[in-house]
Regions:
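Rossmann-fold NAD(P)H-dependent dehydrogenase/reductase core
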Residues: 2-187
């Protein structure tokens, strides 16, 4: 549970740290995005479903207002935003990264959380959908965002982290134990 003492209000004169959370419209991704937003991060929700992403943005921004004691999000100095991303499409990943780099210089945290549990379907890029969404897509996303993560040096207020680049957090699950192997779709 988040409380007002968890709220870190970023002064308007300084830029809040930037975080991207994939698969952030539900579950662990949503909770992660919400916790980062309440703690002062400008959070970009990278979601496949535009409507579900917008609903999550509204919930997070409402939580910020409630926890931080402000009805006007702009007074709090941070918010969450949606930027559509489909990890099953290399074109979507490239478009996401291009849009991000046009809007922002620095990325402080990348949380690779999105995942699907599907088998058999093949993406437009010719890979099995689960393999592309859960592994290859995150790898490409991370690779394309490394320049922005490297620019995070010297953006932290604490000298303890001053020389460190942005952080990459990769989440996984044990659901791979439940999926039967299908060698035909792995080629």
């Amino acid at each position: 549970t988040l409380h007002q003492e968890d709220c870190f209000i970023t002064p308007k004169s300084s830029s809040p740290p930037i975080a991207i959370v994939t698969g952030s419209n539900t579950g662990v991704g949503f909770e992660t995005a919400q916790a980062l937003a309440v703690r002062g991060y400008h959070v970009i929700l990278a979601c496949r479903s535009r409507q579900k992403g917008l609903d999550a943005v509204d919930k997070i921004n409402q939580k910020i207002s409630t926890v931080c004691g402000s009805e006007d999000i702009s007074k709090v100095g941070k918010a969450s935003f949606l930027q559509p991303l489909d990890l099953a499409s290399f074109a979507s990943i490239r478009s996401f990264c291009k849009t991000f780099s046009e809007k922002y210089d620095v990325l402080n945290i990348l949380v690779n959380n999105a995942g699907i549990n599907s088998q058999g379907d093949v993406t437009e890029d010719g890979l099995e959908i689960c393999f592309q969404s859960n592994f290859v897509g995150h790898f490409l996303l991370t690779k394309l965002l490394v320049p922005s993560l490297m620019k995070a040096k010297n953006t932290y207020k604490s000298n303890k982290y001053k020389e460190e680049a942005g952080r990459i957090v990769n989440l996984s699950s044990v659901t791979h134990h439940f999926a039967p192997s299908n060698e035909r779709t792995l080629s």
